[in-house]
Amino acid sequence: MIEYFLPLLLLCVIQSGTPGPNNIMLTASGKNFGYLKTVPHMAGVVIGFLSLLIVLSLGLISIFITYPLIQTILQIAGSIYLLYLSYRIYNSYSSENNSRSKPITFLESSLFQYVNPKGVMMAITTISIYTDFKSFEFINTFIEGMIFILIAFTISNVFAVLTWTSVGVFLNNFIKSERSIKTFNGFMAILLVLTVIWINYEFYGS
């Protein structure tokens, strides 16, 4: 079991923990709104992604393979939404006496997982590799493989959302003035836009 689960967990930690749309937005939210107000956002990432894994395991992967246009549409929709979120981050502002924006809600965060290009590809890749019970002696059925995947991604996603939100909260100790806050939000928005460009470059293979 260890020989199967540890490589799976490592893969999930790497995929979940590396910079991407969710982690960039969580860092910005941690900085602008603090830990408590970012909890719904964090919970939405974890639960939304787990629900995506379950939906994909029920047959959506085969639909993507049969009808690639669906994946393309989701890719475009996700990219447009990410650009909107980058604009939203850019216009965020918070200080002790002023607030012009609201953190991402649980529902928004959960639904975003279904159009998050990085997340969808993570899920498809992991399910395709680690549910092949012909390649792994330890698992006997597709369901067993999915159980291990769900456990691994729960651990890795909880670790990732807590870590990246903590980074944002930590940065709040140094970014206090209105000018520095605007600079930070602008930088995070640019990172999100660059992520959109990179994801689409990878997707279309240009």
Give the role of each language-model region:
Residues 3, 104, 114-118:
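Juxtamembrane cytosolic amphipathic helices that cap and anchor the N-termini
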Residues 65-94, 154-167, 172-206:
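Selective transmembrane alpha-helices of multi-pass membrane proteins
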Residues 20, 34, 116-117, 177:
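Short loop-to-helix capping motifs
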Residues 21-24, 83, 121-124, 161-165:
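Residues that mark transmembrane-helix kinks and helix-interface sites
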Residues 13, 17, 50-51, 87, ...:
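Hydrophobic/aromatic residues within the transmembrane alpha-helices of Major Facilitator Superfamily
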Residues 109, 113-126:
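Selected transmembrane alpha-helices and immediately adjacent juxtamembrane segments
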Residues 2-72, 125-149, 153-154:
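Juxtamembrane transmembrane-helix termini in multi-pass membrane transport proteins
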Residues 91-105:
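Flexible cytoplasmic inter-helical loops of multi-pass small-molecule transporters
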